[in-house]
């Protein structure tokens, strides 16, 4: 009998702090048993994609660079857009490979935290990231006004 759901994790998961990824920065990540790459484009938008270039498999998070809204693979310079599409190939700049895509992980930033959506089949979010401070109005909405239970993480989140 096939169950109508997966036993694998599905939902929004905190994957870091907003302050950890500056504009133009590329970071390797490992979550959900997958290598990922996080980058903040030149406009300040944060993106998370599958970590390996579809050209020859280099990990984009190790040495990759941001060019506009794309992340560039350090191996041969292929560029991948925030929608996962191949946008540029150095030796054929007018003809990117539109058949190749990287998996895109939807990302939200809330109160200095970075959350990524994971669903094993790659489906889009089934619900929005809840705003816990609005859900529980008796608590202050200032992120500096609440107690962080792990002091070693608090120092990483400071501005």
Question: Which residues fall in each region the model found?
Answer:
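Rieske [2Fe-2S] iron-sulfur-binding subdomain
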Residues: 1-46, 68, 79-159
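A glycine-rich beta-to-alpha transition motif near the start of alpha/beta enzyme domains, typified by
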Residues: 50
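Short cysteine-rich clusters marking metal-coordination/redox-active sites
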Residues: 53, 73
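Cys/His-rich metal-chelating microdomains
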Residues: 56-59, 79
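The serine-hydrolase catalytic nucleophile loop
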Residues: 58-67
């Amino acid at each position: 009998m096939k169950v109508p759901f997966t036993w694998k994790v599905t939902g929004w998961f905190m994957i870091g702090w907003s302050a950890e990824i500056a504009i133009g920065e590329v970071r390797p990540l490992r979550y959900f048993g997958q290598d990922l790459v996080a980058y903040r484009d030149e406009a300040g938008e944060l993106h998370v994609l599958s970590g390996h270039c579809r050209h020859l498999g280099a990990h984009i998070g190790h040495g990759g660079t941001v060019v506009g809204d794309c992340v560039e693979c350090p191996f041969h310079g292929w560029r991948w857009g925030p929608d996962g599409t191949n946008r540029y190939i150095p030796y054929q700049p007018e003809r990117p490979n539109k058949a190749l895509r990287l998996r895109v992980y939807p990302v939200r930033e809330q109160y200095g935290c970075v959350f990524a959506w994971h669903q094993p089949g790659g489906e889009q979010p089934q619900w929005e990231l809840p705003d816990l401070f609005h859900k529980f109005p008796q608590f202050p909405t200032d992120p500096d006004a609440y107690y962080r239970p792990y002091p070693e993480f608090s120092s990483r989140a400071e501005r």
